[in-house]
Amino acid sequence: MRKLFLISIGLLIVSTSTFAGGLLTNTNQHVLFLRMLARDASTQIDAVYSNPAGVAFMENGFHLSLNGQSAFQTRTITSTFAPFAGFGGNATKVYKGEASAPFIPSVFAVYKKDKWAFSGNFAVTGGGGKATFNEGLGSFESLVSVVPGMLVAAGNEMVDKGVLPINIFNGTNKYSVDSYMRGKQMIFGLQLGATYRITDYLSAFAGVRMNYVSNGYEGHIRNIEANIGGGEMVNVNKYFSDYAKQARTAADAYLAANDLANYAKYDAIAKEATKVAGLTADKELDCDQTGWGVTPILGLDFKMNKWNIGVKYEFNTKLNVENKTRIDNTGLFANGVNTPHDIPALLTVGVSYEILPVLRASVGYHHFFDTNARMADAKEPVTGQTMGKQHFIKQGTNEYLGGIEWDVCKWAQVSAGMQRTKYGVGDNYQSDMSFAVSSYSYGFGAGFDIAKNLKLNVAYFWTDYDKYTKETPNYGGTGIAGKDVFTRTNKVFGIGLDYKF
């Protein structure tokens, strides 16, 4: 049951994943990304994040951008596991978790003077959502679902040993549990840097991003019930606590009467009942995690005539999160313990071309170096060896982007774009607690020059995810075969204002 609670809390730790980008990175920091996607060769205000060397080609002056996004995500896991039939009668169950971030803010600023530009931005660079799981997950429920079979098997063993005359647990084939989990994950990033235009065509950027992680998890597992002996549903913990007391009273009486044979029998019953009662006791957790790390960033931009090329490299961010635990009767989240939480290095390359004075197109490429980032430990299912989850990733994440923008008139632009995301994770990485599914993302929107130096951007962005099927002969560590099918949905709305002083 300790393993049960670890799994259910584990799902929280990774449940509030990013809305666009790699395993732990948000790339949708500006509304211009939402409405065009391929922004890696930008020379507008959003270049502060997407192409920081490109700000050297902005107009002289002070530029400011304020953005707000609303993101809504669902995760759906269809799990098939024979013992699930003990709770509802169906071996296949659909588990759905919802994560939402009603408001994700970001601020961009640039001061440009001749060959120099100084830029900064503040944004939610990772996570950004809260997730609630009211019905648990398959990996969680699988460990509860085997309780009826475990009791029947234990009864047979006690009969074989002569401890019980008959198996009083025969007929136990149903279970239920009350579980609740809620989690949030936020990575706040403050980026500062300087860009210098080396020649009329070439500029370079150097800067850093300070990252602060704030995670929070709370949950409980209560009232595990079973129809013991085929009877009514009863609380398993209370049943075996009472059973243990009765057996201990009988054992003490036989010991006092010097009846050692019956003493040994009832002593064994008391010990087994106490063990089951402990395993099925209620569990609770209330824990926060915090940590910080620094990301060095370098960039280059080459601009000539109608062409622009931008390159950015973000170094791997070494980062640990520390437990700040208020309640934990599981023994799994000790106060003060640190867990690896690195942000993978990122390489981006973008090319833009002005097809016509009113028509522009861009393409981009992202590569996340996921295999080099330290992650929380997990067990290799075959060997049982504990290692960082990065060892279960075959190759880093690759993203391919394209977008186009058209000036409808002097004061309005429309744009659209798409992105293909390909994850390199293997079966051992995937679980209903943490899964990455390759996808296609689409965005469209418009920009409106509502005043001489003021621009309004609006956009809608959504993602179509593939389905990933994982079959295992040891579902949830139970020794019984099972299958999960993973998929997700993602929708983001954005609005922003760009102003030049």
Predicted regions and their residues:
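Transmembrane beta-barrel strands of outer-membrane/channel proteins
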Residues: 64-72, 120-124, 206-210, 311-315, ...
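Outer-membrane beta-barrel translocator domains and adjoining extracellular loop/strand segments
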Residues: 76-83, 131-137, 216-225, 231, ...
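Repeated loop/turn-to-beta-strand initiation elements of outer-membrane beta-barrel proteins
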Residues: 62, 115-118, 201-204, 306-309, ...
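Extracellular loop and loop/strand-boundary signature of outer-membrane beta-barrel proteins
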Residues: 90-95, 175-180, 281-287, 332-338, ...
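Residue-level signature of outer-membrane beta-barrel architecture
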Residues: 56, 110-113, 192, 196, ...
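Outer-membrane beta-barrel "beta-signal"
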Residues: 446-448, 460, 487-501
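Residues that define the transmembrane beta-barrel architecture of outer-membrane proteins
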Residues: 46, 100-105, 186-190, 290-296, ...
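N-terminal, post-signal peptide beta-strand-biased segments of exported outer-membrane/organellar beta-barrel
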Residues: 15-129, 435-438, 461
